[in-house]
């Protein structure tokens, strides 16, 4: 079975009520809420708690100052702020970007500090769409294998896999197959995107018009025959 979710940001407060209604009317199964760590009042999320709907969190990424693999990043301070929202809504999954850096020991220490078995680490593109010359960690098979040595819970993003494969000049579908087998995810990010770019893009799915989009659709259907996925 496939569960489908609706993506919102914590800054989309004007959409919260409508999103909850879509869950109640079974258009979607749950909400993935991206948390912008701007110190907002936790009571802003009361609508979700009162509605008692399933929810997952996408933890902040580097654009909002959270980089758990960078030793100079105040990840512990940001996490303490995030913990308030996590405790309030009790999300069933926490999606985490490894972001940019090379020190896996730092990531391991941060994961130990977070002490959260709900964390799902997402594969990354190689290049940043925001900062020139920034290289992400978690874009290659070798790096995912290194992460798997210290953490076993993943979210697979098809758009990021496509972008990474193009950056590496390797076959996109074969790369995705190997990565999915290695990560063994139950949680996926799907979107429409331009085919010939290294940049990570996420557009609304309007049509399944490319070979990789068809691959994505068929892959999810085949995995869902064996286990429940989101």
Task: Name every feature range the model reports, one short phrase each.
Residues 23-24, 86-87, 181:
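Non-catalytic positions within long, well-ordered alpha-helices that form the structural scaffold/packing
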Residues 1-81:
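N-terminal pre-domain/capping segments
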Residues 38-53, 106-112, 138-148, 170-186:
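Short amphipathic alpha-helices and their capping/turn segments at secondary-structure boundaries
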Residues 49-62, 113-118, 144-149, 212-226:
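Alpha-helix-loop-beta-strand connector modules within alpha/beta enzyme cores
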Residues 2-8, 29-33, 55-59, 92-96, ...:
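Hydrophobic faces of well-ordered beta-strands that scaffold small-molecule active sites
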Residues 7-11, 34-38, 58-62, 99-101, ...:
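Active-site beta-loop-alpha junctions enriched in small/polar residues
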Residues 65-153:
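Active-site acidic/histidine proton-transfer and metal-coordination neighborhood
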Residues 65-74, 132-137, 162-228:
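Gly/Pro-rich active-site loop or hairpin
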């Amino acid at each position: 079975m496939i569960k489908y979710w609706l993506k919102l940001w914590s800054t989309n407060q004007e959409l919260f009520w409508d999103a909850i209604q879509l869950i109640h009317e079974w258009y979607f199964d749950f909400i993935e809420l991206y948390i912008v760590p701007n110190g907002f009042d936790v009571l802003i999320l009361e609508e979700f708690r009162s509605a008692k709907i399933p929810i997952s969190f996408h933890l902040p990424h580097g654009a909002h100052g959270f980089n758990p693999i960078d030793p100079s990043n105040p990840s512990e301070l940001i996490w303490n702020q995030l913990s308030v929202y996590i405790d309030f809504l009790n999300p069933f999954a926490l999606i985490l970007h490894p972001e940019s850096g090379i020190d896996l020991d730092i990531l391991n220490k941060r994961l130990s500090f977070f002490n959260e078995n709900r964390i799902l680490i997402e594969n990354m593109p190689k290049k940043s769409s925001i900062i020139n010359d920034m290289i992400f960690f978690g874009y290659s098979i070798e790096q995912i294998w290194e992460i798997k040595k210290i953490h076993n819970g993943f979210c697979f993003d098809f758009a990021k896999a496509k972008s990474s494969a193009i950056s590496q000049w390797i076959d996109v579908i074969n790369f995705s197959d190997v990565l999915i087998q290695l990560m063994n995810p139950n949680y996926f990010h799907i979107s429409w995107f331009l085919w010939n770019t290294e940049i990570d893009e996420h557009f609304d799915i309007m049509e399944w018009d490319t070979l990789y989009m068809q691959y994505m659709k068929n892959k999810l259907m085949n995995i869902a025959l064996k286990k429940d996925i989101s």
